[in-house]
Curated annotation (Swiss-Prot):
The keyword Ribonucleoprotein does not apply. It comes from Dictyostelium discoideum. Gene3D superfamilies: Glutamine Phosphoribosylpyrophosphate, subunit 1, domain 1. Its EC number is 3.4.25.1. It catalyses: Cleavage of peptide bonds with very broad specificity. The active site is at 35 (nucleophile). The 26S proteasome consists of a 20S proteasome core and two 19S regulatory subunits. The 20S proteasome core is composed of 28 subunits that are arranged in four stacked rings, resulting in a barrel-shaped structure. The two end rings are each formed by seven alpha subunits, and the two central rings are each formed by seven beta subunits. The catalytic chamber with the active sites is on the inside of the barrel. This is Proteasome subunit beta type-7. It is an enzyme of class 3 (hydrolase). One of its GO terms (molecular function) is threonine-type endopeptidase activity. One of its GO terms (biological process) is proteasome-mediated ubiquitin-dependent protein catabolic process. Coiled coil: none annotated. One of its GO terms (cellular component) is nucleus.
Amino acid sequence: MENLNRGGFDFDLCNRNNVLEKTGLRMKGFMKTGTTIVGVVYKGGVVLGADTRATEGPIVADKNCEKIHYIADNIYCCGAGTAADTESATALISSKLKLHKLSTGKQTRVITALTMLKQMLFKYQGHISAALILGGIDINGPSLHTIYPHGSTDQLPYVTMGSGSLAAMAVFEAKYKNDMTKEEAIALVAEAISSGIFNDLGSGSNVDVTVIEPSGVTVLRNYQTPNERKFRNNPYIFKQGTTPVLKQDIAPLSTKVVIEDIMMGQ
């Protein structure tokens, strides 16, 4: 009998999928998502930013969604990827950290949230479509982390993620400096998000900013609205005869009426 406990990766399912695809089965395609999320560390805290466009393929599903999620009183998280995955993942970790805080009686540390998120995403091997930027402040000071869908992480002074990340990173690389003030950090984050909005089709609408300081958190919802829609107060009214009639053809209308008697059975 064949030993089923052989080591290494088993390609049987891959071969099966190839056979099914050759017989005409349409395999599930890759889901393209779009977002621009950024974060930057300044002298006294952390500033997070995100756009507000949610898409369903080529369709704009929501023009003013929230992508900066609450984790703890001193920690927030930006999410890129599938909206349901980012919201569920952050809500789950937020509830676990609440229980952890009640158990320990101490302020939640950023590294605790980072560890919980990366362990959960690694366990699902990238099948949870959530690319996250975690920012917060604790006894170790302000910190900023990126968490990729497979569970890998980075800690940097400024980060970008999402389909508009390249445009946003170009702004950071050109204008970031050490020991920025809060006002400079907010302006830089807003410019980076705007760059993603105007250079990436998957990002759009408004700019959301969240400032995390030792004294508290400031949520600046719709901090900038670079794509504000304009509406006309009055409809277009054209005078009769404005458009010239080049050709006129009148055809007689003939109708044919057919009357049938239907005998009902007794």
